[in-house]
């Protein structure tokens, strides 16, 4: 199975294009904030927790590629959040990442943001595994599942 989300610091993040599922599994490499915003707006990235992870990773991308100045990071956080203003986790995690970065010296920001995104990613993997283990016990041999909003690791 292809991973839904992968960090590739400091150059990029990789996502599974969810608009093509279930017929095709295509990984997209995202190397800048503009490409991330396009992917979020086009619903290639879906689900509240994954959108939150994308918001944090987007700030890490911005710090690595555009410079980690207060102005650049604040702009990146606003642009990312504006792509899906009703996606609460997106705005929360982008805001948390911005707050973390602004409290640090400029030369420490990119590394700290990638570490924050990695921690969120690890949390997501563990939570998805727990949801899957719990849900597996509820399925019968040939049961059906209807997902709503957060499909976890699909």
Predicted regions located by residue number:
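Positively charged, low-complexity intrinsically disordered leader regions
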Residues: 1-34, 38
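Short pre-catalytic strand/loop immediately N-terminal to key active-site residues, enriched for Gly-Thr
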Residues: 41
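N-terminal active-site beta-alpha-beta segment that forms phosphate/nucleotide-binding
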Residues: 44-154
């Amino acid at each position: 199975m292809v991973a839904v989300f992968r960090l590739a610091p400091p150059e990029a993040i990789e996502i599974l294009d969810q608009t093509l599922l279930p017929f095709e599994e295509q990984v997209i490499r995202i190397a800048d904030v503009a490409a991330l915003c396009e992917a979020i707006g086009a619903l290639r990235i879906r689900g509240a927790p994954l959108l939150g992870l994308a918001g944090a990773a987007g700030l890490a991308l911005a710090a690595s590629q555009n410079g980690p100045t207060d102005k650049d990071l604040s702009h990146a956080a606003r642009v990312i959040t504006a792509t899906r203003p009703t996606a609460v986790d997106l705005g929360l995690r982008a805001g948390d990442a911005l707050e973390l970065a602004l409290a640090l010296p400029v030369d420490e920001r990119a590394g700290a943001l990638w570490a924050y995104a990695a921690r969120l990613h690890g949390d997501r993997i563990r939570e998805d595994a727990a949801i899957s283990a719990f849900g597996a016990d509820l399925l019968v041999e040939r049961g059906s599942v209807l997902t709503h909003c957060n499909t976890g690791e699909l």
